[in-house]
């Protein structure tokens, strides 16, 4: 997004591992009631949010008040004090990258199995469209953003054991490696789940929950792309009015 994130390692003596699988400490208001959480990450989350909003509105027929695409952090094994996961303009103990998380876009799926399968297929198809061919394999659209904070990751309930995983495999049109992940942990040795060309980590979103990003990251222009005011202002104001992008307790920049 803004170059390789600088990782400040967390003190080893402070145990802030994610303790529960029920989303404790994670965002509890980002999704409308009755939906299940999935997330997709591959580089800077700004432009990816717009891509998924387009899928929701144009392919799934969701109305603006029904949209679920929000940016945040996920797939790390730790949180900061008080369960916080923040961008890097904050207490170093809460930095998302140092805690092992990646930038992702959260999306909501119906609890109806048939509907959910159609939704995850649409999201997965768009996700794999967000890569381009290179001599070394499939590269994301913003390769200047490097490191585990920008790694390719998909979070679905149950991970590779999810019934959705087969759909992910079917939509993997370029044959990228789908690698089972258990969450990235940062240490002096480096990441346990790194940013690897042509590889997508697939994790269990019920074990590794989504942490909503700060308000100023939501409905943002893309890298080198200016989006319409209907997206930047009107849609953001609507979602804000629903109470779904309230301050997270992390430092905020002008909104």
In which residue ranges do the predicted regions lie?
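Flexible coil/turn and secondary-structure edge motifs
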Residues: 2-255
């Amino acid at each position: 997004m803004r170059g390789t994130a600088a990782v400040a390692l967390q003190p080893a003596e402070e145990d802030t591992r994610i303790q529960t699988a029920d989303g404790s400490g994670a965002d509890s208001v980002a999704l409308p009631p009755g939906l299940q959480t999935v997330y997709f990450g591959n580089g800077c989350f700004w432009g990816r949010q717009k891509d998924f909003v387009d899928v929701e509105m144009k392919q799934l027929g969701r109305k603006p008040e029904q949209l679920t695409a929000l940016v945040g952090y996920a797939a790390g094994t730790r949180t900061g004090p008080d369960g916080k996961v923040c961008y890097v303009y904050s207490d170093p103990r809460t930095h998302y990258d140092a805690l092992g998380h990646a930038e992702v876009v959260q999306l909501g799926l119906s609890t109806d199995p048939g509907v959910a399968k159609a939704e995850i297929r649409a999201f997965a198809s768009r996700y794999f469209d967000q890569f381009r061919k290179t001599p070394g394999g499939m590269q994301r659209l913003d390769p200047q953003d490097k490191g585990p904070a920008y790694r390719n990751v998909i979070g679905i309930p149950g991970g590779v054991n999810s019934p959705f995983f087969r759909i992910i495999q079917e939509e993997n049109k370029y044959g990228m490696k789908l690698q089972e992940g258990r969450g990235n942990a940062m240490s002096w040795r480096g990441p346990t789940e790194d940013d690897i060309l042509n590889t997508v980590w697939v994790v269990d979103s019920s074990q590794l929950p989504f942490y909503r990003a700060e308000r100023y990251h939501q409905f943002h222009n893309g890298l080198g792309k200016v989006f319409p005011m209907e997206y930047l202002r009107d849609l953001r104001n609507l979602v804000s009015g629903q109470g779904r992008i309230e301050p997270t307790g992390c430092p905020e920049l002008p909104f």
